[in-house]
Curated annotation (Swiss-Prot):
It comes from Mycoplasma mycoides subsp. mycoides SC (strain CCUG 32753 / NCTC 10114 / PG1). This is tRNA modification GTPase MnmE. Binds 1 potassium ion per subunit. GO terms for cellular component: cytosol. Homodimer. Heterotetramer of two MnmE and two MnmG subunits. GO terms for biological process: tRNA methylation; tRNA wobble uridine modification. Residues 217-373 form the TrmE-type G domain. It is found in: Cytoplasm. K(+) binds at N227, T246, I248, T251. The lineage of its organism: Bacteria, Bacillati, Mycoplasmatota, Mollicutes, Mycoplasmataceae. The keyword ATP-binding does not apply.
Amino acid sequence: MLINDTVVAPATNISTQAIALIRVSGSEAFLIVNKLIKDKKLEEKRGLFLRKLYFEDELIDEVVLSCFVAPNSFTGENVVEIACHGGILNTNKIINILIQSGARMALRGEFSQRSFLNGKIDLIQAEGINNLIHAKNELALKIGVANMSGSNNKAIIELKDNLLDIISRIQVSIDYPDYDDVEGSSIEDLTNLLEIINDQINKLLMRSKMAFKNSEGIKTAIIGQTNVGKSSILNALINEDKAIVTDIPGTTRDIVEGQINLENVSLNLIDTAGIRKTSDVVENLGILKSKNLINEADLVLFVVNKENINDLDNQEIFELLKNKTYILIVNKAEKLSKTEKQNLEKKYQNIVFTSAINHDIDQLVLRINQMYLNEEINKNDELILIGLNQITLVEQIKNKLSTALSIIKSGMPIDIVNVDLYDAWNLLNELIGVEYEDEIIDNIFRKYCLGK
């Protein structure tokens, strides 16, 4: 893939703001920007410069230019970043003039793509930048920063090197069958080495899938009888009146959705119809949906109050919650005495007390964060991948290694093993971008922001 033109895009949101940043990158970056400068033309050198921009002798703006000379820039190309006065009209006008002067409007993620293609960052770092920008919670932010910096990427390099070592040992035994006493080349040795790599890949996949789910959002159903405060819980969590809150039983007949981003996890919240005995056909459809959502949800927030906790309808819900991850929420806790709370804590597991109408849900938020505080995905020195394409590649690597292990343990000819090991090694190269297809790379970077 060869990209040799010069591109421009806003690096900040185009809106009514004090300052906007416009990025120009490519071999002709200085030449194009100089077309807008009358006096003190830019030289190809690094620095900060104050200049006035003109178009057809009309003063457009007074700006600060941050200049970088290839290869010492983010993209590896000549780069001029224009800090101009903000505003939709002003920012767009400068961009349009730069396009008329020879630049092309950059595609989404094209600056990061150029950085990757010019060897400034690998593919894991590139995806880390995107993860950082789109992080919904502290966990995703932490993973994005770690992957962007490349601090944990050596794990993939080590896996590649170790796998190549096994491939080489097998190849030696194939090419020189008489030398069967080469150290570390016995079937037992190769199996042990391969199992170590397989275990590392399995752990990477486990961490990554868990972190991906926490980052994208856990499907969370808020269930309970009518008028116990389910909608108040939803509104308190997302800090907006998305669900109708009244004293009339059966107000929420359908599904209401919202999202909340906590420290360790994001929740995709679903407020469901209250579960009760009713002859109302429409309400019964909502109740059936509520019961089905219990099976589909990753986490259930089961809301009760002190008056109805032992009702038969709630006992039915407790039965549905067997083998499910759930939190029992006793709402309207302001009506409970300290002794009543202690007695309930002794009787029920994973219980919290809230007063959602007063927005007192601290216990609930703390409990959810604790539940999803996983040591495996909170280690600072472990590689975690949360891009869907990355996780798919790791799954493919896992499958190739599993097949290779099955072959070597079955006693089949050793040369057959190398086919799957070579495939796994090539997939590791694809993971960090040593090998890639142009269409796949385009697809990855088009998911990025314009200007990045």
